[in-house]
Regions:
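General small-molecule cofactor/ligand-binding pocket signal
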Residues: 8-10, 110-113
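Acceptor-substrate binding/catalytic loop of class I
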Residues: 60, 77-97
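Short, solvent-exposed loop/turn segments at secondary-structure junctions
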Residues: 63, 116-117
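Short, flexible, mixed-charge acidic loops at enzyme active sites
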Residues: 67-78
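Short alpha-helix
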Residues: 89-112
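Conserved SAM-binding loop
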Residues: 1-68, 95-98, 136-140
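Generic structural signal for helix capping and beta-alpha/helix-loop junctions
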Residues: 66, 119-121
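Core SAM-dependent methyltransferase catalytic element
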Residues: 122-141
Length: 141
């Protein structure tokens, strides 16, 4: 079977998939958690959708002064890449907070990396610097 035949993509609320009892080998939530009202509940739902030993991958913005300067001040107000008010600094999570929330949701964080945007090439690159944008990979216990 071709990989594309096995990819499942659907625009639906996370809770609906949980209610349907769906599970997946890998669950990705990229640039979402900083917009949800209850990150712990959100991670519990991600965990419920992930099979045992399956992968859960999240990306978000660190709650740091550097992230405030680049993700809010620069991206929203100076460069206007995003509408003003898209992000609230208080909704950002530190890597330590995200790790703790995921652990409580039975997801063991295995790896974390930063990623940075290169405006010259227009590409995102992985980095050791998790002070602004970061991505976490974990497995369901």
């Amino acid at each position: 079977m071709l990989l594309l035949e096995r990819v499942y993509c659907r625009s639906v609320m996370l809770e609906k998939l949980v209610d349907e009892g769906r599970t997946f080998d890998a669950v990705l939530a990229l640039e979402v958690i900083e917009h949800v009202a209850n990150p712990a509940e959100f991670c519990n739902s991600l965990s419920a959708l992930t099979i045992p030993n399956g992968a859960t991958i999240l990306s978000t913005i660190n709650r740091s002064m550097r992230a405030y300067a680049s993700a809010i001040v620069a991206a929203e107000y100076i460069l206007q890449w995003l509408p003003k008010g898209t992000h609230e600094w208080s909704s950002f999570l530190t890597p330590e907070e995200l790790t703790m929330i995921l652990q409580r949701a039975s997801i063991d964080v295995k790896e974390m990396a930063g990623f940075v945007y290169n405006p010259i090439t227009g590409r995102w690159l992985l980095s050791d610097d998790i002070s602004v944008n970061f991505i976490a990979y974990g497995t369901k216990k």
